[in-house]
């Protein structure tokens, strides 16, 4: 007996539900999403499929929309981009967002502050480039002058060497010959000795005479004199007065015996 229960009342496997479109789809599918753009959310209205501000102010750019709305206003922005082509619309919206963000960061200067900073950087870089170019020109001039002065310097050095060699030749010609008798030139010490020795001229004549005799005779005479005279006066007691030469044999012998004392006096 067939049962009267329908088979479709309690299905064994439920049917899959369709997926909702994601938020990254085109603007035509934005109305099917639960999140509206930042402009529509601020105005508390439903985001239309042809919303002009939805591509530029999505729901996660609420702060940027507030900056643009505070500076320009939603109605003015819509009027600006309404009659523009898509490339021009993108450029206009990029400019509006940049200017509004700059005003929010710097309420006094805004974009003008950024322009001043860029102009200062340009001027500083231009001055630095000018200084570098001046230094390069200076170094090039120095290198050019040095390159042209090298032959002149070499010629001047050769002239100096030739003049120096000629002056040396003249000095050598005017100098004393190597075979000139040097004994004719008296040194100052020798001249002083000759002048001071005039007081002992008589004694020097006797010394030269005594040096010509035999040394053995002098030794023998000295020994005999020591035997005869035991008390010999020291050298300091010898009188420095000059005695006149007396050609007497006994006096000559006495002067011969006084040879050591005379040599000591002259050496002192």
From Swiss-Prot:
- Any idea where the LOB domain is? 35-136
Where is this chain compositionally biased, Low complexity type?
Answer: 22-31
Q: What InterPro entries is this protein classified in?
A: LOB
Q: Which cysteine pairs make disulfide bonds? A: none
| Family annotation (Pfam families) | LOB (PF03195)
Q: For the region Disordered, what residue ranges are annotated?
A: 1-31
- What's the superkingdom here? Eukaryota
**Classification via PANTHER family:** LOB DOMAIN-CONTAINING PROTEIN 22 (PTHR31301:SF67), LOB DOMAIN-CONTAINING PROTEIN 4-RELATED (PTHR31301)
State the family it belongs to.
Answer: Belongs to the LOB domain-containing protein family.
Its recorded name reads LOB domain-containing protein 22
Query: What organism does the record attribute this protein to?
Result: Arabidopsis thaliana (Mouse-ear cress)
